[in-house]
Amino acid sequence: MREGEPEVWAETPAVDLQGSGRKPGSRQFRGSSPTSLSAMIGPGEPGLFERMLGRENMLKALRAVETNRGAGGIDGMEVGQLRGYLKEHWAGIKERLLTGGYEPRPVRRVDIPKPGGGTRMLGIPTVLDRLIQQAIHQILSPIWEGEFSEHSYGFRPGRSAAQAVKAAQGHVNAGKRWVVDLDLEKFFDRVNHDVLMARVARRVNDRRMLALIRGYLKSGILAGGVVEARNEGTPQGGPLSPLLSNILLDDLDRELERRGHRFCRYADDCVPRARDEPMSSSGAQLHNR
């Protein structure tokens, strides 16, 4: 057992889940099997999808979910119940993921007040879907991270809002005192799924990965006891949404760079700056696009 790892990861004799009489997807959150979750996850294989499901990546994802905690999704499972559930059901979950039979659950809608008025919608995934999204994020993020614009600060490793503010102040000190406020109103709610998936497919050719990501985009939202179909948007609340937003908005970053503008973007907040007022016409052109 890895030093500092909770006892649940200790190597113990494996059992035959197929002969246990329990369905892998059954609603039972407390696992009683002595099977080592570490052993069940397995060593993984070299393909992109197999790397996502590999032992080390899944363990890292689980630790991230447990560290971030957060509320449960529509099934009522809490983060503290996840390890026991995985020990009982991971073999079946992994099989369904590998064969394309896994279906993400709808997210639970939560509306939170915004400082300036109005509300922001969050979509809270189940903790199991949060785990899988985190595992996807960890595999896909390095593919794009080296390509993202230096002017993008939101939801990126080693970058922060404080750094974005410092960079913006640097633009002011350099004499770029005209500011254009790019309005990306309700960006997360209006993302076109086909456009987004086309951007992802530029760098990912694993059809299973693409299908799983699209499954999360279309998983639906539970609000008022009714599941609403989702044909657009990628609601905030899961680990995958921030990365997908940066992938889509990278085109905006590249267009601003092509025009020679200095700017700072943090998620859907973007503030280009210029020395002269005429840059406002560029802002209007970008808005119309």
Label the predicted regions.
Residues 1-87:
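Non-catalytic, polymerase-adjacent accessory regions of viral genome-replication enzymes
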Residues 40, 52-55, 59, 84, ...:
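Non-catalytic regulatory/linker segments of enzymes
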Residues 61-65, 135, 212-217:
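Short alpha-helical scaffolding segments that buttress acidic/His motifs in well-ordered protein cores
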Residues 121-124:
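Conserved phosphate-binding loops in nucleotide/dinucleotide-binding enzymes
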Residues 127-128, 132-135, 169:
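Duplex nucleic acid-engaging cores and interfaces of nucleic-acid transaction enzymes
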